[in-house]
């Protein structure tokens, strides 16, 4: 049985997948399957990752646990392509938790194309279950921000740590994840969702001149606590404005707002690129990206036509295990 206590290699997956054709066929013919949305071939799907356009083809990766529709197994990156966002080709998993850097899961991340190569950044999760001090929040756990370079989007290269636990500020716990890259005037910015040791969500910002060597620069936060963790940050420029989208966890409902277990909101950002510093502009409660109950962990990218495209997970942490499709071997979609 695959679980988050053991590494999973491509060979492990392929041996297991060889016996799943009947199950995959049954899932494909399920009457509850959607017509125009990405859904898992088997098991569980969540966050979109590594969204990028190469030529006339869009590449979409996503978090994938094919082993357990209720998501109790290890997380891989699955790969799909499309030219029209109507028909998709499932290329299969390409990133596996097969090393000491990501043995408990290849968590969310992004892709950035530079000089003909694709730079993937993702969080390698390592849970030290055998340690007496393992508590998931403060100790016994590593979240490594891993860099992989590839020329072929189906064949990822060697894994190396770009930013690791030794690079996090002293007041940050073990929850640091979901790297996303922005370039501005020749400098690269990596944003990471984070949780402080006193349970305040924020976004850490690192800078680099070459996509290889990263230094901590600053953080983005509110003056008052707004959730205990900010996941899946996405910092981008849109129509001359700088926008931060992120997913705060632990925010209390406010009337009709924030009724999900965890939220997805956006902030206008005032940037001093020279310092650098990034401050949340305006006051009041941040607006939700989507007011529905099934939109979380979105990621955006700019395509060749200059459009800012966003894909989200049609689901939400701590809210999806009761889906009726779990008993049929699959769950969730991208939207």
Enumerate the predicted regions with their spans.
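Beta-rich carbohydrate-recognition and catalytic domains
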Residues: 1-178, 183-228, 239-291, 312-335
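Repeated scaffold domains used in trafficking and secretory/extracellular systems
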Residues: 231-233, 296
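Anionic-ligand-binding alpha/beta catalytic cores of soluble enzymes and soluble regulatory domains
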Residues: 300
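Structural secondary-structure packing elements that flank or coincide with functional cores
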Residues: 303-304
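Short, well-structured beta-strand segments enriched in hydrophobic/aromatic residues
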Residues: 308-309
């Amino acid at each position: 049985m695959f679980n988050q206590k053991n590494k999973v290699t491509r060979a492990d997956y392929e041996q297991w997948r060889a016996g799943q054709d009947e199950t995959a066929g049954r899932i494909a013919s399920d009457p509850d399957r959607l017509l125009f949305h990405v859904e898992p071939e088997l098991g569980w799907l969540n966050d979109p990752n590594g969204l990028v356009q190469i030529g006339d083809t869009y590449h979409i990766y996503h978090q994938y646990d094919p082993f357990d529709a209720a998501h109790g197994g290890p997380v891989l990156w699955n790969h799909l392509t499309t030219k029209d966002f109507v028909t998709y080709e499932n290329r299969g998993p390409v990133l596996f938790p097969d090393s000491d850097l990501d043995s408990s899961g290849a968590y969310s991340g992004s892709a950035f194309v530079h000089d003909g190569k694709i730079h993937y950044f993702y969080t390698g999760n390592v849970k030290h279950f055998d340690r007496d001090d393992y508590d998931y929040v403060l100790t016994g756990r590593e979240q490594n921000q891993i860099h992989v370079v590839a020329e072929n989007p189906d064949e990822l290269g060697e894994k190396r740590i770009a930013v690791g636990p030794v690079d996090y500020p002293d007041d940050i716990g073990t929850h640091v994840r979901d790297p996303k890259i922005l370039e501005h005037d020749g400098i690269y910015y990596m944003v990471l969702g984070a949780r402080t040791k006193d349970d305040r969500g924020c976004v850490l910002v690192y800078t680099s001149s070459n996509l290889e060597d990263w230094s901590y620069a600053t953080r983005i936060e509110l003056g008052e606590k707004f959730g205990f963790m900010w996941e899946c940050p996405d910092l981008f420029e849109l129509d001359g404005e700088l926008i931060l989208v992120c997913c705060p966890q632990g925010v209390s409902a406010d009337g009709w707002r924030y009724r999900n277990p965890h939220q997805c909101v956006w902030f206008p950002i005032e940037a001093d690129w020279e310092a650098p510093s990034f401050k949340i502009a305006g006051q009041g409660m941040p607006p939700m990206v989507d007011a529905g109950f099934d939109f979380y962990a979105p990621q955006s990218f700019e395509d060749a036509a200059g459009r800012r495209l966003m894909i989200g997970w049609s689901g939400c942490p701590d809210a999806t295990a009761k889906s009726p499709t779990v008993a049929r071997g699959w769950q969730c979609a991208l939207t």
